[in-house]
């Protein structure tokens, strides 16, 4: 169990006079990696950026949750220190942590643990980055055993690819409709009239009472709009930003397929014309039909994701004996490496799609609950004002 809660925002001032907002992150967990079951640290936005950077660097091929949008602070009275801006950022940072803490791979990352607990987070970040770079530069030869993987996996996995595109398309459509509906509703609330036509038979005293009630409703409507912005609209936009991350994964897969097909054409050409390239692999003639006959990779809802420790860099495609862009590399070797990269990418894409489905369900339910909560607060405020008046 790993539960993170952001609370107690605080405006702090540096010696230089610069101000920033820090947030308390309270963590509850029964994981043995933590000394305490409940603890807290204070973090600012730059610390979240560091976490996002190191996760993106070490967990390539995974859909790392995006950071909150950098809203145009000029649209908020008070800029980045305005209550509305801080509320929206807190909401998005909470969503970011929720996604990370429930992700089957990221939630087991030492980077995540250190972010939540280490008081010297900045120092840890720089050391971890340097160690990651050193491990990456050493490389690792993973070209062995590729023939056996070719017999078991289909690099194209067309059904997985189509499923991913359809899921993202449907999510985009639903989110756009929901956001449009919310904006229209907020506009109708914002245009709530303050003046009303006065019937000829209405006394001045009654008119004053009605006018006061309308002004009171207008004030409550402003609170409702602000609450909608900081909670509901922000939640929808955070989901839209998450979709962008998955779209980039789809584009990356398309590029890898093209790369695989490019090397496949080169090897086939060399096999058909062996005199044109002394470096062609003689075994490719036997390997090629196997690729075409392998069964298609089907998405499975019960995929188990393997985790990685901090210093075994969990990059899905480490440096190899041959670089895919190296001119003097063996074409067959490049084809095999490209094939392996694509197969591993397919596996991770399937895992990420399963997680995305769960997050869409959880976050949409949470958004609808926010809509209800906003209106409960709105009508409760009106009733409380009437109670005080009486």
Swiss-Prot record:
Entry protein name? Sorting nexin C1711.11
Q: Where in the cell is it found?
A: Cytoplasm; Membrane
- Please provide, alphabetically and separated by semicolons, the GO molecular function terms listed in this UniProt record: phosphatidylinositol-3-phosphate binding
Task: Kindly list the positions annotated as binding a 1,2-diacyl-sn-glycero-3-phospho-(1D-myo-inositol-3-phosphate).
Answer: 44, 70, 89
Which UniProt keyword terms apply here? Coiled coil, Cytoplasm, Lipid-binding, Membrane, Protein transport, Transport
Query: From which organism does this entry originate?
Result: Schizosaccharomyces pombe (strain 972 / ATCC 24843)
CDD domains attached to this UniProt entry: PX_Atg24p
- SMART domains given for it? PX
Kindly indicate whether the keyword Methyltransferase belongs to this entry: no
């Amino acid at each position: 169990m790993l539960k993170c809660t952001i609370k107690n925002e605080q405006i702090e001032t540096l010696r230089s006079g610069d101000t920033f907002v820090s947030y308390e992150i309270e963590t509850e967990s029964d994981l043995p990696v933590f000394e305490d079951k409940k603890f807290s640290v204070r973090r600012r936005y730059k610390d979240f950026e560091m976490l996002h950077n190191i996760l993106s660097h070490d967990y390539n091929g995974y859909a790392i949750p995006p950071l909150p949008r950098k809203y145009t602070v000029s649209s908020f009275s008070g800029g980045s220190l305005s209550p509305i801006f801080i509320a929206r950022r807190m909401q998005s940072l909470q969503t970011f942590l929720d996604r990370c803490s429930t992700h089957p791979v990221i939630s087991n990352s030492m980077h995540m643990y250190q972010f939540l607990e280490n008081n010297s987070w900045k120092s840890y970040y720089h050391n971890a980055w340097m160690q990651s770079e050193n491990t990456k530069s050493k490389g690792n030869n993973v070209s062995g055993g590729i023939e056996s993987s070719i017999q078991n996996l289909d690099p194209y996995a067309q059904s997985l690819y189509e499923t991913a595109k359809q899921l993202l398309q449907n999510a985009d459509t639903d989110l756009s409709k929901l956001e449009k509906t919310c904006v229209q509703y907020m506009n109708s609330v914002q245009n709530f009239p303050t003046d009303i036509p006065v019937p000829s038979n209405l006394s001045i005293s009654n008119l004053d009472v009605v006018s006061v009630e309308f002004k009171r409703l207008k004030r409550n409507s402003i609170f409702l709009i602000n609450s909608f912005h900081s909670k509901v609209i922000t939640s929808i936009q955070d989901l839209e930003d998450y979709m962008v991350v998955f779209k980039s994964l789809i584009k990356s897969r398309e590029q890898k397929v093209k790369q695989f097909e490019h090397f496949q054409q080169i090897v086939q050409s060399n096999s058909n014309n062996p005199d044109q390239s002394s470096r062609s692999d003689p075994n490719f003639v036997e390997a090629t039909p196997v690729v075409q006959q392998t069964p298609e990779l089907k998405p499975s809802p019960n995929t188990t994701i393997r985790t990685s420790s901090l210093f075994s860099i969990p990059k899905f495609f480490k440096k190899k004996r041959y670089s895919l862009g190296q001119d003097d590399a063996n074409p067959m070797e490049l084809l095999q490496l490209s094939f392996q990269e694509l197969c591993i990418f397919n596996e991770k894409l399937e895992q990420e799609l399963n997680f995305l489905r769960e997050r869409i369900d959880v976050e949409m339910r949470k958004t609808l609950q926010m809509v209800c909560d906003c209106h409960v607060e709105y009508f409760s405020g009106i009733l409380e004002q009437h109670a005080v008046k009486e």
